[in-house]
UniProtKB/Swiss-Prot annotation:
One of its GO terms (cellular component) is mitochondrion. This is Pre-mRNA cleavage complex 2 protein Pcf11. SUPFAM superfamilies: ENTH/VHS domain. It is found in: Nucleus. Associates with the phosphorylated CTD domain of POLR2A /RNA polymerase II. The keyword Phosphoprotein applies. Pfam families: CID, Pcf11_C, PCF11_charged, Pcf11_helical, PCF11_RFEG_rpt, Pfc11_Clp1_ID. Keywords: Acetylation, Coiled coil, Isopeptide bond, Methylation, mRNA processing, Nucleus, Phosphoprotein, Ubl conjugation. There is a cross-link at residues 291, 328, 456, 654, 723, 1278, 1419, 1511, 1524, 1546 (Glycyl lysine isopeptide (Lys-Gly) (interchain with G-Cter in SUMO2)). Residues 475-486, 494-508 have a biased composition (Basic residues). Residues 14-142 form the CID domain. GO terms for molecular function: mRNA binding; RNA polymerase II complex binding. SMART domains: RPR.
Length: 1555
């Protein structure tokens, strides 16, 4: 022993090392990594001597690993067993069952599916008995697990059957009545008999079987109970194929089948010998049995997986099997069919066992019992019918409460324990069923097959089959149910698609989250209760999961799910009202559907039906939008309807078409300012211009955008306000389909409610249109007027590049008006697009798109911030009804009480509506509603007047603090007005909306201010005093008037006192123009980042629309369309409050004080409300009592709307006024100075400045009334406005254009100049904030691929850049075809020089190769030429050929092409051969001869002369002097020639030069 000790010690050490190494590697196997598993397998093979230790390590790891990490370890075991085998196989086999069960118990459904697949590969590896034991054990945990029966030879070899037992067995199975029960009864005695007869050799095997049998016996007991349940379920499933509860009786039936199989399995071993002996004739029976077994849904499922047979195939097979099956099998089959969907899922494993069991039983029965299966079948069908009747009764109970049914059934059996087990198994089955959705589908189709049994189901199944007879249908149906009705109807469409897919896919589609036992659910509608049992959140979760999976498969589904979610939240309130109608519509759902949480889809549907009068559900819109399918949204019809009011054959004169709205409005306002036209005419013209351009825009957008309905412009802007907001398309805001439109209050106001819309200012050159129908969505409270807000960015925006477009759904009816903030369209990239009806019930989401591409888009339910990529940036989701903290973002009133989705309560805690983001209950609620103290209900964001809001500082922040959300809504906490501060994350470019009111502002001015980042683009921030929102685009425009422009809505600062919104652009924004200047004056555009206000010349008091503090209410009041109720606008009383008051006197709705009130001194108006309380700052006394304030409500819409809408006086006033007021400073915004502002009723959207005080007539409510283009055209011509293009254009246009664009250009230039050079990369400089740099990042044309921006002057570069992208994409695709390379390291210069236009390397290469190629070409060409002259055919052989000039003999070579000898480097001229160079020289010299004599050369040939001379010298030596003389003479001649020639040449050159 001592000798062995060292060896043992060494072995032990090696073992420890191997185990340690293996353990450490094994612990790293936390996910399914094939390389890692392969490595561990190889390691195991290398350590084969330590197989037992390694196996124990693996088993221990399997036991202790988290459930998510168990499967990889099982895969490792599988890999080792299959690849190494030997000792490992033996070692793993010992504890295979325990290991497998350990994993199976703790993992989820998806992992169980993987385990099933894994188990299915072991038949050839592990002993069949071990696998059988494993199957039985797993089946006890999950009845859906199929038990693969042992082959007959294994059974016979291991078990000797007592002949007595053989005699008994046929009898027992033959008992027809108790199909299941008899086996259960007979089995127990059978086991002891078998034991007695077994030889000891087989005792061990028998013990294993005995354990399995015990399990089977338990299952048999369950079967009895389940038979009863199955009967009940037949009726239920047939009558209603809806979700079943997890506990579901449905699961029980599946158990029945499972359990039935086990009993049969128990008998099977015993019967095997019988079959061998007596039933050798059994083949026919076996065939029948096989067919019968095929009926088994599980078997079908298997066949689906293995053979991919389609359902129809299976159905035929089933029919055949049914006809052929034994009575017993037929009975079981019907029940199975009834439960088939369930069974299929739960019993995929049992299919096999059932087959054999059925075969055995059928054989024994057929022998002992009546031989005619048909009779049995008939009797069986009768039984089934009876069962059906029972099941029908039960179905009612089930509908009420599936659990109740279950209990009753359980009671009948009196086996509570069994019931509990059943439930557990049912739950497990449910999981499995999810896995086996395909089976369920089959089951659904099978249901029809059964003789008459399925008739009840037929209605349901037919529906589902209409959707697709394929298996997928049932699953889809299930899903839809589980989801809630909404998905149902959509599902009807999607199922077909899904069904077409392969069964596997279908299964996959069935998300595990789907309600348990999807199959069952389908079959038994009663089980709907299960859904109820699920908590809504779980349902939602499931839906979300399902939707994600389904989305992949079915775009339609995806749309629905997306829509559903947002709607769910928004509609949850509405669900109450809409629930019943939906139920009626979808009566196939049980009444519980009402209780059940309704999907947004259903609710919307009901609402829409009610509101839209049977218009198609918005879902469709959304679907069309999301799927980009052209499904018309209900809006489309609306648009058509509205458009009908416009002549179909409407012809617009070229001048009008070519004219820019901005110019027309500007000119019109100028005419008004100069007194050439009256206020009324001005309003009418503006209104008509607006209509005309809206109509044109709508047409263009429709052509341009795939989802016309989604964009507010598409719809005629003028839509009846009456229509439910739902219809309004504007909901583009939500990004969701129109559903999300903000709904204006119920009234859909015409988009331009009142002249305000038309107000030139809006349309004015700046085109900053802040217009919203009064009622449209951004309704700042006006109860009537949702006032959509349309803030069109700088004139350039529509026509120009105005970065900001705040556009309410003017076109939207009913406040569907979405806010649409679009940043400058062009380069700026619309930094902010706030669009979509905000509160739209339907969809209500905001969509903020920041220039950067941030898209802040909320579904109705919530805001959804999407990052530039379109990826959801953000956390802010406002959804849910107010009570519900939807989306997790919950805005609470100061008290902290959850106001509801976003609900800002007053400080008092009353849910005043602060910011209430909720779908309006009615259409009206939808819009963002800024409710004043009135607290009018209205969904959407409700900015309530400061009063109510007091102090509620809201901070609308994306997920808190999350910049992404970008919205920061924070109100002044202290402000009474509760200024809202809506502010995007500052740093955040995109989001930008910062709605933040100045702290002090009374009236809670809102400050809507985009993130400081340029992206933010919009900052609406109302000075305190100025309750108005101040839209200050961060970088975006500042809507302070453009200098040249009439200040369309010049800065929307209300008069100072007035809270009117002030639109200011942040300084950085290049685009933004500030429309502060009086219209006539060019106010230098003020691009201030800060809301600097650019007041027109100081004198113009009005120019800045700061309304005197007194006006303060939110100065939204001014604009009817948008009304910020912060102050109660309704109250007409002037604001007497001291500045300090934060609009305590909401009562004074906006007061428009007389101009006199307005601070006449420019300074006064100058106040930006925001300063301090701002109000206090106002030089004018706050008391504005004198002014007429607009009635709040009247103004309501106008408040915002009025920016654009401000009644002409307002808007116009503002704008016009800006023109007028600006021009007539004293005039309060467009209102006559002395004139009072009359409250504008929502009907009169515009404030009319009526000296008499009478309200000027508002634009006709018939907003869609035909635009009398000819009348408008004639008016424009008459007033000279249209001549602008010719005459006025020279003056006004040119001046305006020069005033505006040039400033923009200057701005761009200035900004460019302001951009600091940061290339030295010093930390201190980089830490500083450079607005110009940020602005630069968000200005210019943006590349759709990479987001790079190019200035308008770089269009060529942009084109090159796009070409570069194309090349890059091509090279990426071609990478596989060619070898590519790059340098390992790039130098700084590479980075700096690199530009996404052309790869410098590529460019250099291409140039290089081109040059090389050119050189090669030239050389080849030259060579070719040379060859042409070089080769000259040689003379006759032997002839000596030499150059005529140099007399050098030519070299000869063989020209293979011509196959003859050639003289190399020779040319033949006139029959003589020369060297090319010699001949060239000769030619050159001869060209100098002035008058070369052709005959002279040949005669005087130098060679001949030389020869002659030589000869003469030889003959006459004494003549040599003569020869010399001749030689001497010749040179002089040459010299003379050469001298003469140059002179000639010079002459020629001179001539040329002179020429």
């Amino acid at each position: 022993m001592s000798e062995q000790t060292p060896a043992e010690a060494g072995a032990a050490g090696a073992r420890e090392d191997a185990c340690r190494d293996y353990q450490s590697s094994l612990e790293d196997l936390t996910f399914n990594s094939k390389p890692h598993i392969n490595m561990l397998t190889i390691l195991a093979e290398e350590n084969l001597p330590f197989a037992k230790e390694i196996v124990s390590l693996i088993e221990a790891q399997t036991a202790k690993a988290p459930s998510s990490e168990k499967l990889p370890v099982m895969y490792l075991m599988d890999s080792i067993v299959k690849n190494v085998g030997r000792e490992y196989l033996t070692a793993f086999t010992k504890n295979l069952v325990a290991t497998f069960i350990c994993v199976f118990e703790k993992v989820d459904e998806n992992t169980r599916k993987s385990l099933f697949k894994l188990r299915s590969t072991w038949d050839e590896i592990f002993p069949l008995k071990k696998l059988y034991a494993l199957d039985v054990r797993v089946n006890s945990l999950d009845p859906a697990w199929p038990i693969k029966p042992l082959p007959p030879n294994v059974n016979t070899s291991s078990i000797h059957v007592n002949p007595k037992f053989l005699n008994k067995s046929p009898e027992e199975p033959s008992t027809p009545g108790t199909v299941v029960s008899s086996p259960s009864i007979s089995t127990p005695p059978i086991v002891p008999d078998i034991q007695k007869n077994l030889t000891q050799e087989q005792l061990i095997r028998q013990q294993l079987l005995a354990k399995q049998k015990q399990l089977l016996e338990l299952q048999q007991k369950k079967l009895e109970l389940e038979l009863e349940q199955a009967k009940a379920q037949l009726a239920v499933s047939l009558s209603v194929q809806q979700e079943t509860s997890n506990l579901g009786p449905g699961s029980a039936p599946s158990k029945l089948h499972v359990s039935q199989i086990p009993p049969m399995a128990v008998k099977a071993p015993h019967q095997v010998p019988v079959q061998s002996e007596k039933s050798r004739p059994g083949p026919s029976l076996q065939i029948q049995d096989l067919k019968g077994t095929n009926r088994d849904p599980r078997l079908n499922r298997i066949s689906q997986h293995s053979h991919g047979k389609d359902q129809s195939h299976r159905k035929e097979f089933l029919m055949n099997t049914l006809n052929q099956s034994d009575t017993k099998t037929s009975k079981t089959i019907p029940s199975e069919k009834l439960n088939s969907s369930k069974q299929e899922k739960s019993k995929s494993g049992e299919k096999i066992t059932k087959k054999e069991l059925d075969q055995l039983d059928s054989k024994s029965k057929s022998k002992s019992k009546s031989p005619s299966p048909l009779k049995n079948k008939l009797s069986h069908t009768k039984d089934l019918k009876n069962q059906e009747s029972e099941s029908m009764r039960l179905s009612d109970m089930n509908k009420r409460d599936p659990r109740l049914k279950k209990h009753l059934q359980d009671k009948t059996d009196g086996k509570d324990d069994d019931v509990k087990e059943k439930r557990k198994t049912a739950e497990k089955k449910d999981k499995d069923e999810h896995m086996k959705s395909s089976e369920h589908r089959l089951a659904g189709s099978r249901n029809k097959i059964i003789n008459g049994i399925v008739q009840k189901q037929d209605t349901i199944t037919e529906e589902s089959e209409k959707q697709g007879t394929k298996p997928g249908r049932s699953s889809t149906r299930k899903r839809s149910r589980s989801r809630s009705p909404k998905s149902r109807s959509p599902i009807i469409h999607s199922p077909k698609r899904r069904d077409r897919r392969s069964p596997k896919r279908r299964q996959r589609s069935m998300s595990p989250t789907s309600t348990p036992k999807a199959g069952k659910i389908r079959q038994s509608g009663a089980k709907q209760s299960h859904m109820e049992e699920f908590t809504p959140p779980s349902r939602e979760d499931r839906n979300a999961k399902r939707s994600t999976k389904q989305d992949i498969r079915d775009p339609r589904r995806m749309k629905k799910t997306e829509e559903e979610r947002p709607q769910e939240t928004t509609n949850q309130h509405s669900t109450k009202s809409g629930t019943e109608p939906k139920e009626n519509v979808e009566n196939w759902q049980s009444s519980k559907s009402a209780k059940r949480w309704k999907s947004g889809w259903e609710e919307n549907k009901s609402l829409q039906q009610v509101d839209e009068h049977s218009k198609p559900p918005h879902l469709r819109h959304r679907e069309s939008w999301s799927s980009t399918k052209g499904i018309l949204s209900p809006r489309a019809p609306k648009q058509q309807q509205h458009r009908l009011s416009v002549d179909a054959n409407l012809q617009i004169p070229k001048e009008l078409t070519l004219a820019s709205k901005r110019e027309l409005l500007q000119k019109t306002s100028e005419r008004l300012a100069s007194g050439e036209i009256t206020q009324d005419d001005f309003l009418v013209v503006v209104h008509q211009i607006r209509q005309l351009f809206q109509y044109q825009e709508g047409v263009r957008e429709e052509q341009r955008s795939p989802f016309n309905d989604r964009f507010p412009l598409k719809r005629p802007r003028y839509e009846d306000s009456d229509k439910p907001f739902v219809d309004s398309p504007a909901s583009r805001f939500a990004g969701l389909d129109t559903n999300q439109r903000l709904t204006a209050l119920a009234e859909d106001r015409p988009l331009f409610d009142g002249p305000s819309r038309p107000s030139v200012a809006r349309d004015g050159p700046t085109k900053m249109i802040f217009e919203g129908p009064n009622k449209l969505s951004p309704r700042i409270d006006g109860p009537p007027t949702p006032a959509s807000l349309r803030f069109d960015g700088s004139p350039g925006q529509m026509g120009g590049g105005g970065p900001l477009r705040f556009e309410g759904p003017q076109g939207q009816l009913g406040g569907g008006c979405p806010l649409r903030f679009e940043g400058p369209p062009g380069p700026v990239g619309t930094p902010l697009r706030f669009e979509g009806p905000i509160g739209q019930a339907g969809g209500g989401g905001f969509r903020f798109e920041g220039s950067p591409g941030l898209r802040f888009e909320g579904s109705p339910g919530g805001l959804r911030f999407e990052g530039p990529g379109g990826q959801p940036v953000g956390g802010l989701r406002f959804e849910g009804h107010r009570g519900q903290p939807v989306g997790g973002l919950r805005f609470e009133g100061p008290h902290g009480q959850p106001v509801g989705g976003l609900r800002f309560d007053n400080p008092r805690g009353q849910p005043v509506g602060g910011l209430r983001f909720e779908g309006g209950h009615g259409p009206s609620g939808a819009a963002i509603r800024f409710d004043g103290p009135h607290g009018q209900p209205g969904g959407g964001i409700r900015f309530e007047g400061p009063l109510l809001q007091q102090g509620v500082g809201m901070r609308f922040e994306g997920p808190h603090g999350q910049s992404v959300a970008g919205l920061r809504f924070e109100g002044q906490h202290n402000q009474l007005g509760g200024n809202l501060r809506f502010e995007g994350p500052h740093g955040q470019p995109g989001v930008g909306i910062r709605f933040e009111g100045p702290l002090v502002q009374q009236g809670g001015g809102m400050r809507f201010e985009g993130p400081s980042v340029p992206g933010g683009g919009l900052r609406i921030e109302g000075p305190l005093g100025q309750g108005g929102p101040r839209f200050e685009g961060c970088h975006a425009l500042r809507f302070d008037g453009q200098p040249g422009q009439p200040s369309l809505l010049p800065r929307f600062d209300g008069l100072h006192g007035q809270p009117g919104p002030r639109f200011e652009r942040t300084p950085g924004q290049p685009g933004p123009q500030r429309f502060d200047g009086p219209p006539g004056q060019q106010v230098q555009p003020r691009f201030d980042g800060v809301p600097q206000r650019f007041d027109g010349p100081q004198h113009q008091q009005a120019s800045r629309f700061d309304i005197p503090l007194g006006l303060q209410g939110t100065r939204f009041d001014n604009h009817p369309s948008q009304r910020l109720e912060s102050v109660s606008f309704n109250q007409t009383g002037p604001y007497n409050d001291p500045p300090g008051n934060a609009f305590n006197a909401p009562s004074q709705g906006l007061q428009f004080q007389r101009h006199e009130q307005i601070f006449d001194s420019p300074q006064g108006p100058n106040f930006n409300g925001p300063h301090g309380p701002g109000n206090q700052s106002f030089s004018n006394p706050l008391n504005r009592a004198s002014g007429h304030y607009f009635d709040e409500k009247n103004l309501q819409s106008s408040q915002f709307g009025n920016f654009g809408n401000i009644p002409a006086p307002m808007t116009v006033g503002n704008i016009q006024a800006s023109q007028q007021v600006l021009s007539g400073v004293a005039q309060p915004v467009a209102f006559g100075q002395g004139q009072q502002f009359l409250p504008v009723h929502p009907q009169n959207p515009g404030f009319v400045q009526n000296p008499s005080g009478a309200l000027p007539k508002a634009y006709p409510d018939n907003h869609l009334s035909q635009v009398d283009v000819n009348e408008l055209f004639s008016k424009l011509l008459k007033t000279g406005i249209l001549k602008l293009s010719q005459t006025d254009s020279a003056t006004t246009q040119v001046s305006e254009v020069t005033a505006q664009p040039p400033p923009e250009e200057e701005e761009d230039q200035n900004e460019d100049q302001d951009v600091p050079d940061l290339t030295n990369f010093t930390v201190e400089e980089l830490k500083q904030r450079y607005d110009s740099v940020i602005n630069r990042l968000y200005t210019g044309i943006q590349c759709y691929s990479c987001g790079m921006r190019f200035t308008t002057s770089q269009t060529d570069v942009y084109a090159d850049h796009l070409d570069w992208h194309y090349r890059q994409n091509r090279t990426e695709k071609d990478v596989s075809r060619k070898v590519t390379h790059r340098r390992w390291y790039y130098s700084l210069t590479d980075w700096i020089e690199f530009e996404e236009i052309a790869d410098l390397e590529e460019r250099a290469k291409s140039q290089f190769f081109e040059k090389v190629h050119e050189e090669v070409v030239l050389k080849t060409q030259e060579a070719a030429k040379e060859k042409e002259f070089q080769s000259v055919p040689a003379g006759p052989a032997g002839a000596v050929e030499s150059c005529e000039i140099c007399q050098e003999q030519f070299e000869q070579y063989w020209d293979e092409e011509e196959e003859e000898w050639h003289l190399k480097n020779a040319i033949r001229v006139d029959g003589k051969i020369y060297h090319p160079s010699c001949y060239e020289d000769y030619q050159n010299t001869s060209s100098f001869d002035c008058t070369p004599s052709p005959s002279k050369t040949p005669v005087e040939n130098p060679l001949n002369i030389m020869l002659n001379i030589v000869k003469n010298e030889l003959q006459e030596p004494c003549d040599s002097p003569k020869v010399k003389e001749e030689r001497i003479d010749t040179p002089p001649a040459c010299t003379e020639e050469s001298i003469a020639t140059p002179s000639e040449i010079k002459t020629e050159n001179d001539t040329v030069e002179s020429v």
